[in-house]
């Protein structure tokens, strides 16, 4: 599972979507997991 901070997610949504095609992306907020992005 890939991980990215909420700041990275907000600054590069295209990259997050690209990675999510291959594996779930955990988005963290202040170091704690808060959301998971997955492709459909």
Model-derived features: where do they sit?
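Residues that mark the N-terminal boundary/hinge immediately upstream of a DNA-recognition element
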Residues: 5, 26-28
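Short beta->alpha transition motifs characteristic of CBS
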Residues: 26, 33-40
